[in-house]
UniProtKB/Swiss-Prot annotation:
It is found in: Cytoplasm; Golgi apparatus; Cytoplasmic vesicle, Phagosome; Cytoplasmic vesicle, Phagosome membrane. It is an enzyme of class 3 (hydrolase). This is Ras-related protein Rab-34. Belongs to the small GTPase superfamily. Rab family. The modification N-acetylmethionine is found at residue 1. It comes from Rattus norvegicus.
C-alpha cells in the first residue's frame, strides 16, 4: 500500500526548469540528460520513485530559511519571526517526467546553541541549500562555514549545492546589484548554483524549488543507471570555474537510448 501523499497538479514537471544565472549554475542545458529522459520513457528508473531524497537548508539565524520553505510548501508568509529550535522538516511530492519523486526539506536552526543538534541531521543529504540575507554581507561570508559543517557529514561528490539569497524585496536595485556580484563569486568558489528569492512576494521561490527537485531527480536517475550496470554515467553536475563551459562532460557522445 502506498502511504505517500498523491502528487499535486502544481508539482508536475514535464521539462527541466532553467537556472537563474548561467555564470553560477550546476549545468546550463535546456533539457534533462538524454539518458534520464530515455529511462523515464522506458520505465527504467529503478527505485527512484520509491525513495525520499533529503535536502538540508542551512544558514545564519533569521536569514529566512523557514519562510522560504513555508512559502513553497504552504504558500504562506509569517511576518512574526520565530526561531527554529533544532530541526523541522516538510515533505514535498513531485512527478518528474512521469515518475513520482519525493523531497524531504530539512529546516535547521541557525542559532549557535542549536548547531550541534542540527548538525546531527545533516548526514545523508543529496542537496544542500545555503541561505543568506541579501541585505547582510556577514551572512554571505558565513555561508562557506555552513557548507563546511554540512560537508563533514556528507560526501562532497554526491551532493548538489545551492546558494540562495533571501529577502530580495528589501534590497534596492543598487544594493542588490552589488550583493549579487559578491554572491556569484562565492557560488563559483563553492561550486553551487545561485538563486535570489523573496519569500514575502514569492519571487523565484517556486522556480527555485522546482529546479532543486529536477536536478536532484536527474542525479538520482543517473546514479540508478550507473548502479544497474550502465557503462557511462553521463554528465557530471559540477561548476568548472576555470572554464567558460560550466558543464563538464564525462562523455561527449549523445545518447539516444538507454543501454
Amino acid at each position: 500500500m502506498n502511504i505517500l501523499a498523491p502528487v499535486r497538479r502544481d508539482r508536475v514537471l514535464a521539462e527541466l526548469p532553467q537556472c537563474l544565472k548561467k555564470e553560477a549554475a550546476l549545468h546550463v542545458r535546456k533539457d534533462f540528460h538524454p539518458r534520464v529522459t530515455c529511462a523515464c520513457q522506458e520505465h527504467r528508473t529503478g527505485t527512484v520513485g520509491f525513495k525520499i531524497s533529503k535536502v538540508i537548508v542551512v544558514g545564519d539565524l533569521s536569514v529566512g530559511k523557514t519562510c522560504l520553505i513555508n512559502r513553497f510548501c504552504k504558500d504562506t508568509f509569517d511576518k512574526n519571526y520565530k526561531a527554529t529550535i533544532g530541526v523541522d522538516f516538510e515533505m514535498e511530492r513531485f512527478e518528474v517526467l512521469g515518475v513520482p519523486f519525493s523531497l524531504q526539506l530539512w529546516d535547521t536552526a541557525g542559532q549557535e546553541r542549536f548547531k550541534c543538534i542540527a548538525s546531527t541531521y545533516y548526514r545523508g543529504a543529496q542537496a544542500i541549500i545555503i541561505v543568506f540575507n541579501l541585505n547582510d554581507v556577514a551572512s554571505l561570508e558565513h555561508s562557506k562555514q555552513w557548507l563546511a559543517d554540512a560537508l563533514k557529514e556528507n560526501d562532497p561528490s554526491n551532493v548538489l549545492l545551492f546558494l540562495v539569497g533571501s529577502k530580495k524585496d528589501l534590497s534596492t536595485p543598487a544594493q542588490y546589484s552589488l550583493m549579487e556580484k559578491d554572491a556569484l563569486k562565492v557560488a563559483q568558489e563553492i561550486k553551487a548554483e545561485y538563486w535570489s528569492v523573496s519569500s514575502l512576494t514569492g519571487e523565484n521561490v517556486r522556480e527555485f524549488f522546482f529546479r532543486v527537485a529536477a536536478l536532484t531527480f536527474e542525479a538520482n536517475v543517473l546514479a540508478e543507471l550507473e548502479k544497474s550496470g550502465s557503462r557511462h554515467i553521463g554528465d557530471v553536475v559540477r561548476i568548472n570555474s576555470d572554464d567558460k563551459n560550466l558543464y563538464l562532460t564525462a562523455s561527449k557522445k549523445k545518447a539516444t537510448c538507454c543501454p
